[in-house]
Swiss-Prot record:
Residues noted as binding Mg(2+) 2 in the record, renumbered to the chain: D135
Listed EC numbers: 3.1.3.7, 3.1.3.57
InterPro entries assigned to the protein according to its UniProt record, in alphabetical order: DPNP, Inositol_monoP_superfamily, Inositol_monophosphatase-like
Pathway(s) where this gene product acts: Signal transduction; phosphatidylinositol signaling pathway
Positions annotated as active site in the UniProt record: D46, T140
Reaction(s) catalysed by this chain's protein: 3'-phosphoadenylyl sulfate + H2O = adenosine 5'-phosphosulfate + phosphate; adenosine 3',5'-bisphosphate + H2O = AMP + phosphate; adenosine 2',5'-bisphosphate + H2O = AMP + phosphate; 1D-myo-inositol 1,4-bisphosphate + H2O = 1D-myo-inositol 4-phosphate + phosphate
Residues that, per the record, bind AMP: S256, K259, R273
Single GO biological process annotation from the record: sulfur compound metabolic process
Residues that bind adenosine 3',5'-bisphosphate: T140, S256, K259, R273
Name of the gene encoding the protein in the UniProt record: SAL3
Molecular-function annotations in GO: 3'(2'),5'-bisphosphate nucleotidase activity; inositol-1,4-bisphosphate 1-phosphatase activity; metal ion binding
Family designation: Belongs to the inositol monophosphatase superfamily.
Protein name as catalogued: Probable 3'(2'),5'-bisphosphate nucleotidase 3
Length: 357
């Protein structure tokens, strides 16, 4: 099966998952949201989205084995032991698939079918073979609040990401450079996709529209750049890096991989992903976004300037932080990153020395 056929299947899967998430978002119930054992929030949309993508890939790629690396599994769902929740997810999945003409007469789905579809996401990935990488609802907190979230699906072949699709149901269709991500409600909802050597495109999620090719910003003066970061406890090194570059604007806060999508079409120039302490980064949080940016002419590296390595299993092999920007800005940005890390390490050494004395 060609990559074009796989891309078509991925677009269909992600579009239907976005349709399900929109239905949940229209009337989010208290019982639709709970906390997992790691205290992170999860919703019926997370599980429904994963089940839809899993089932669509299975149906569309009938002659291809589907290895899926995804965020959720049914273990957490079984822990809450709520038949009503599982029944709601099952109905959401059934209704979503039935809304597509090609699936309207498919065999009825049971709750066990949905649980099995969710658990198809237990693959470990790795450097050999083909693996789909799914973020079923990226930015669950944003989804719950009615803010930005994304559904990202990528294909890994022999350790390399070769295509990616991302639905951003709350992102304005028109480019929002300098517009603080504001738009008319009827113009909201984007589907981004890209594949190796073919560029990145965007089209409407809600209506039939011709795809438009997108490219990263042409700004080459770091002081004029704007940057994205997640909603979380402020990370001091972000401010240090921005200061070294001469960036004066406050960061644009966006949940999820939507930052990759916005950067790919020039809504901003820099996305930094550093944490206070080094921690594992799940591949599903970056796989689709990385190829969407790179095919739009951008660069995605770790803090040392190395390309992100998605071949090591469920977690990225990377150095210290993630840097997403344009080719024009990357050299100066990496210099600022190296200087900032060095200063941070020196400060930590001083603090440790003072404690000893």
């Amino acid at each position: 099966m060609s990559y074009d056929e796989m891309l078509s299947a991925a677009k269909k899967a992600v579009s239907l998952a976005a349709r399900l998430s929109n239905e949940v978002r229209k009337s989010l119930l208290v019982t639709d949201v709970w906390n997992k054992s790691d205290d992170s929030p999860v919703t019926v949309a997370d599980y429904g989205s994963q089940a839809v993508v899993s089932l669509v890939l299975e149906r569309e790629l009938q002659n291809e084995p589907v290895s899926l690396v995804a965020e959720e599994d049914s273990g957490e769902l079984r822990k809450i032991a709520a038949e009503t929740v599982l029944a709601r997810i099952t109905e959401l999945v059934k209704d979503t698939l039935a809304s597509d003409e090609s699936y309207a007469i498919a065999s009825p789905l049971t709750s066990d079918d949905v649980l099995n579809a969710i658990d198809r996401g237990k693959s470990e990935g790795g450097p050999k073979g083909r693996h789909w990488i799914l973020d079923p609802i990226g930015g669950t907190r944003g989804f719950i609040r009615g803010e930005q979230y994304a559904i990202g699906l990528a294909l890994l072949v022999e350790g390399k990401v070769v295509l990616g699709v991302m639905a951003c149901p709350k992102l304005p269709l028109a480019s929002t450079a300098g517009n603080a991500l504001k738009s008319l409600p009827e113009k909201v909802g984007c589907l981004f996709y890209g594949s190796v050597g073919n560029g990145t495109y965007v089209q409407s999620l809600s209506v039939d529209s011709l795809p438009a090719k997108v490219e990263v910003s042409s700004i080459d003066d770091p002081a004029k750049a704007s940057f994205f970061e997640s909603y979380h406890t402020p990370v001091p090194i972000h401010n240090t890096i921005a200061t070294k570059l001469g960036i004066k604007e406050s960061p644009i806060k966006i949940n999820s991989q939507t930052k990759y999508a916005a950067l790919s079409r020039g809504d901003g120039e820099v996305y930094l992903r550093f944490t206070r302490k080094a921690r594992p980064e799940s591949i599903w949080n970056h796989a689709a976004g990385s190829i969407i940016v790179s095919e739009a002419g951008g660069k995605v590296t770790d803090a040392a300037g190395n390309p992100l390595d998605f071949s090591k299993g469920k977690y990225l092999d990377y150095k210290r932080g993630i840097v997403v920007t344009t080719q024009k800005l990357l050299p100066r940005l990496l210099t600022a990153v190296r200087e900032s890390i060095k200063e941070e390490e020196e400060e930590e050494e001083k603090a440790a020395s003072l404690k000893l004395h």
